[in-house]
Each structure stands twice: as structure tokens, then as C-alpha cells.
Amino acid sequence: MRARNVLTLVMTFAFPVAVLAQGSGKTNAKPTPKPAESRLVVVPASDMKWTDLDPAGAPGVKVADLWGNHASSTFGALFKLPAGFAAPLHVHTYDMKVVIISGTYIQAPEGKPEFRLGPGSYFLQPGGNYRHTTTCDKASDCVFLVESKGPFDLNIVDARTAPSR
């Protein structure tokens, strides 16, 4: 008799709770959304598509877009400056995250000492009114990765001003 009472108690309370807990099979957990770019992209260095950035204004400077488009939108791209290249005092509209891959990249903020960065170095360059010159050391070409939330631009502050090296 006692076993029958226990069984009745279990069936009365435990079974409905188990059914309610199981419900319709739906849960409150939301599926994890897949990122927009959910495909593998592999581009060996030998397959990079390098183009001239601005043959008239920046001779020899090359760019290879990795994602986005450096000329019109958010982007990530490799830039290549020829050894000894020097850009005059200028600003950019958007912030840029930069990682040096090869060569010695030299930047001189207006009125401040220059900094020289080698492979593996990183800097965040503010957009807007950050006036600076950019030079690639004469020893070798400079290659660096740039990521930006907006298109690349180079607005010369004074075309007569060039870095003194």
C-alpha cells in the first residue's frame, strides 16, 4: 500500500513537472548568429592584387585591399611604400590602425619628435586634425597593414612642406 501511495504521489507531481519542463521542445536560448563573412578566404602573398594608390601624387605607392575598398568604404589593406618615399605634411579623415610588416616606417607628428617603427609594431593614428609626415627608411620598402572605418584619403596640409631627413 505504501508503494502505491508513493507511486501516486510521483505521478501526481513529478510527471506533470517533467512534462512542463520539457514543454514543446522550444527554449529561450537564441541561436548564435553566423557572422556575415562565414566563408574561409585565403590569399597567398604571391596572389595579392597590388594597384597604384595615386601615380601622380604618390609615385610608387601600392595598395592591396584585403577586405572592403580603401577608396570608398571601411577597409583593411596592405600598403607598400618604396624605400625612401616621403609624404609631405598631411592629415587623414578617419582613424587608422596600422601594423608594420616590413621595413622601417617613420612618422613625424607636427612639432614633435619622429617615431621609427619596425616589423610587428602597431600604432593607432587619429583622423581629423592629426598633422604628420610619413617616410619609409631608405634601407628597404615598407609594407604595413591598415584598417579603417572609412575610405583612405591623404589631405596635404602644405604642399611645400616635406619631411627633412
What are these regions (language model features)?
Residues 87-89, 106-108, 131-138:
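Short beta-strand His + acidic residue motifs that chelate non-heme Fe in jelly-roll/DSBH
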Residues 60-66, 77-85, 102:
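N-terminal post-signal-peptidase region of extra-cytosolic proteins
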Residues 82-85, 92-111:
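Glycine- and acidic-residue-biased ligand/ion/polar-headgroup-sensing regions
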Residues 71, 110-129:
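Short acidic-glycine-tyrosine-enriched beta hairpin
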Residues 118, 127-152:
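Ligand-binding loop in jelly-roll beta-barrel domains
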Residues 72-92, 124-130:
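Conserved short histidine dyad/triad with adjacent acidic residue
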Residues 22-75, 159-165:
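A short, N-terminal "cap"/entry segment at the start of jelly-roll beta-barrel domains
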Residues 8-18:
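Bacterial N-terminal signal peptides
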